[in-house]
Design a protein with these regions (language model features):
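Structured beta-strand/turn binding interfaces of compact recognition modules in eukaryotic regulators
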Residues: 2, 17, 24-28, 267, ...
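Residue-level marker of positions within ordered structural domains that often coincide
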Residues: 19, 43, 269, 280, ...
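ADP-ribosyltransferase catalytic core
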Residues: 47-71, 282-375
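Long, positively charged binding patches that form subdomain-scale interaction surfaces
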Residues: 231-310, 317, 323
Length: 396
């Protein structure tokens, strides 16, 4: 059970064992206290906590998945032989783990797929909220679903509706990182259960990924696409997610797409391990995050400078980045037939695939052209299967 008010973020766990049960309680992010009770006091204590405003989350606590601060080079996995690839895979995981340990109480709390889904549903509810009090009420529920490290919860709440898009973006990023860790653990567990005699494989094999070093031709292509940002190029890797790549190739064939494009996508450092593993995912929150003018889609840029603003690099416009290194990806996107847009209309805020078809039957993407409304072109797709990662690029 958890309570999340403006000044509290407390939990109270009740664990039965025989004719007794143990209570673990405290403020989320601090050390817990323990006390043992006879089983006869279970009902009394439960009702007492419910009356005090605690929320029963036992329904979300089935099929528990512990998210631990692991090490990719433990005995569970075969060592990745290529040092460059082993290093980048470990770095990507470390950045994800740090984001979780900085924001969630993972040392003593467990995360389930049900918790992730509930938090995502609550985040989606925030999209349509205009009242600050209601916004904060839902936000507190999110904090209670997956407990967070907070000294004072009120510091994390919206002061006005001007804070909404920033908070939604931050919460979505954190949840995406957590989701990536849960998906990884589920994948590992399912593979382990299928193998009677465990044969060590690399983490890339387990996750269905392929990494390889870029050759000179790749680097020339990447730098040309970076254009004015090419001086920031540091390193790059060819990346293939077998699942999203197969899905993309099937989409291109089935839809008769004749032209695909390599386009840029930027994101914070801690997000990339999740993005590489799960692909870019359509989320209702995309429509309200600052800079997302064209609704419920996945956003790409032909010019690297545009995507750079969404990374962790110091001075990044949309994220307020402060890192001396950052990552972007060149994604292959099924461009097909575009719906060309040269001026903004408020109807685009609610765009999705159905509205795209209403505006331009047969269109595969919305291409927003630079001009009065934008400094740089943006290309938005409204189906997840329209894209897959091809290159991961590090910038400094």
């Amino acid at each position: 059970m958890v309570t999340a008010t403006a000044n509290n973020n407390k939990y109270y766990n009740m664990t039965p064992h025989g004719d007794k049960w143990t209570a673990e309680y405290g403020r989320i992010g601090s050390s817990c206290q323990r006390r043992e009770y006879p089983i006869s006091q279970w009902e009394k204590k439960y009702n007492e906590k419910i009356k005090k405003g605690y929320i029963d989350q036992s329904g979300l606590a089935q099929d528990l998945i512990q998210v631990e601060k692991g090490n990719t080079e433990n005995s569970k996995y075969k060592k990745i032989e290529n040092k460059s690839i082993a290093d980048i895979v470990e770095r990507l995981q470390q950045m994800a783990r740090k984001a979780i340990s900085d924001n969630y109480t993972i040392s003593s709390n467990k995360v389930t797929q049900a918790m992730v889904e509930e938090a995502q549903n609550l985040l989606a509810e925030l999209v349509d909220v205009s009242n600050t009090e209601k916004f904060n009420e839902i936000l507190l529920n999110i904090f209670s679903v997956i407990p967070r490290k907070m000294k004072n919860v009120s510091d994390y709440l919206a002061k006005s509706n001007k804070d909404f898009s920033r908070i939604i973006a931050d919460e979505q990023d954190l949840l995406d990182v957590m989701k990536g860790q849960v998906v990884q653990k589920q994948t590992e567990d399912s593979i382990d259960s299928d193998k009677e005699d465990h044969i060590p494989t690399t983490i890339l094999d387990v996750m269905g990924l392929e990494f390889s070093e870029c050759n000179n031709d790749d680097i020339v292509k990447i730098k040309a696409s970076l254009s004015s940002c090419s001086n920031r190029f540091y390193s790059a890797w060819r990346v293939k997610n077998k699942r999203t790549s197969e899905r993309f190739e099937n989409f291109v064939v089935n839809e008769g797409i004749k032209n695909t494009k390599l386009l840029w996508h930027g994101s914070r450092n801690e997000n990339w391990w999740s993005i590489i593993n799960t692909g870019l995912v359509l989320k209702p929150t995309n429509a309200v995050i600052t800079g997302k003018m064209f609704g419920y889609g996945i956003y790409y840029a032909p010019k690297a400078q545009k995507s750079l603003g969404y990374t962790s690099l110091e001075g990044a416009y949309w994220t307020g980045g402060n890192s001396n290194s950052a990552f972007m990806a060149l994604m292959e996107v099924a461009y097909g037939k575009p719906y060309d847009v040269y001026s903004f209309n408020s109807k685009y805020y609610n765009f999705d695939y159905e509205r795209l078809q209403s505006a331009c039957p047969g269109a595969n993407c919305l291409h927003a052209h630079a001009g009065n409304m934008l400094r740089n072109d943006e290309i938005i797709v409204y189906k997840e299967e329209q894209c897959t990662i091809r290159y991961l690029v590090e910038l400094r």
